[in-house]
């Protein structure tokens, strides 16, 4: 016959009874803020303390915190033990500073006796105000009056932002179907907002405003900067075309002037003056040219050898003219006569060259 339990054993059983009834004796289920799985929205840089609770059971379990799979150190931890083989319950607290890169917080409980483990999880939804990563526009000619403008803005926000395009006349009404949304799995919180407009007048500036529950962000889009790609290319083409046209005109004018000069030279013909050909000794020589009368000047660098013609080539008419124009006392019909003895050299047909003394030099030729 079994004896009734003593006072000490009865007191021990009464202490374990609430834990055994709530957990089902051996079923260890941790909870974070009273829930096994939950989602919590936090603002960026917000601090929040999470508490993990576990009911009593046999043995003494171990509690640990994991943030995105990384083991964390608990802020406070307390387990209530009842005897050596059971505990009545425990709590553990962990404080999180929210960042947008954080996603999940886990409280893990492990039973050392059975090796079983249980987890409680909280999904972190970190919210932040919109960030405009990039904004731009592309212009093209429209079929009607004005310009066809494609505006785009890359906005990063959580929760997703409402984007409004504003010009100098106020907000631009845009159909949401014109928005192109990128794949959120590959680009978290990044949305491409694109809208196509037709401007009938050039706005001073364009701006985009992104708003959500956390905050508001705006960015301006100056019109002169946007129209640079549309204006610079035609202007450059005009400058290049003007330069080419000017160069062509100058070249054509030069060619016409050269042709006119050549035509005039051919029309006038050769010069009436005798041509002088320069010799190797830099002296001018007469080439088959009849010398002028004796009272005309000769070139200063002319030598006597250049003016001595062949006596056989002298015509009788020229000889008679020279005798009529010469003084009788200076005639020298025979070589080596009076003129030769007086220092004169007779040049038949062509006249005489006189050599006299000079004050500035030894002699001068006339």
From Swiss-Prot:
UniProt record, GO biological process: negative regulation of excitatory postsynaptic potential; regulation of protein stability
Glycan attachment positions: 106, 162, 175, 192, 205
Keyword annotations of the record: Cell membrane, Disulfide bond, Endosome, Glycoprotein, Immunoglobulin domain, Lysosome, Membrane, Secreted, Signal, Transmembrane, Transmembrane helix
Membrane-spanning parts: 233-253
Biased composition (Polar residues): 299-308
UniProt keyword Transmembrane present: yes
Region span, Disordered: 299-335
GO cellular component: extracellular region; late endosome; lysosome; plasma membrane
Protein name, entry field: Transmembrane protein 25
Phylogenetic placement of the source organism: Eukaryota, Metazoa, Chordata, Craniata, Vertebrata
């Amino acid at each position: 016959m079994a004896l009734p339990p003593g006072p000490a054993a009865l007191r021990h059983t009464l202490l374990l009874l609430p834990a055994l009834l709530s957990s089902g004796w051996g079923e260890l289920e941790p909870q974070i803020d009273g829930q096994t799985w939950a989602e919590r929205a936090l603002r960026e840089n917000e601090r929040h303390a999470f508490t993990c609770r576990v009911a009593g059971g046999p043995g003494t379990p171990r509690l640990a915190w994991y943030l995105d799979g990384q083991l964390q150190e608990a802020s406070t931890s307390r387990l209530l033990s009842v005897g050596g083989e059971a505990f009545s319950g425990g709590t553990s607290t962990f404080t999180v500073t929210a960042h947008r890169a954080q996603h999940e917080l886990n409280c893990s409980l492990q039973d050392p006796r059975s090796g079983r483990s249980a987890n409680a999880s909280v999904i972190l939804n970190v919210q932040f105000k919109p960030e405009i990563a990039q904004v731009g526009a592309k212009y093209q000619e429209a079929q009607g009056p004005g310009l066809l403008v494609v505006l785009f803005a890359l906005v990063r926000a959580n929760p997703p932002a409402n984007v409004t395009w504003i010009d100098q006349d106020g907000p631009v009404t845009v159909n949401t179907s014109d928005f192109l949304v990128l794949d959120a799995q590959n680009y978290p919180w990044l949305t491409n907002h694109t809208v196509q407009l037709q401007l009938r007048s050039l706005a001073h500036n364009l701006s985009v405003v992104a708003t959500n529950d956390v905050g508001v962000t705006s960015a301006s889009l100056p019109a002169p900067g946007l129209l640079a790609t549309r204006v610079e290319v035609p202007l450059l083409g005009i400058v290049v075309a003007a330069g080419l046209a000017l160069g062509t005109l100058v070249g054509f004018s030069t060619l016409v002037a050269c042709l006119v000069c050549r035509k005039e030279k051919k029309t006038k013909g050769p010069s009436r003056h005798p041509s002088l050909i320069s010799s190797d000794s830099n002296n001018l020589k007469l080439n088959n040219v009849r010398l002028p009368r004796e009272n005309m000047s000769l070139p200063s660098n002319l030598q006597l050898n250049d003016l001595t013609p062949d006596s056989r080539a002298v015509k009788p008419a020229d000889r008679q003219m020279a005798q009529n124009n010469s003084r009788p006392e200076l005639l020298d019909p025979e070589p080596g006569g009076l003129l030769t003895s007086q220092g004169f050299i007779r040049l038949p047909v062509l006249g005489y060259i006189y050599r006299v003394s000079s004050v500035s030099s030894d002699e001068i030729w006339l």
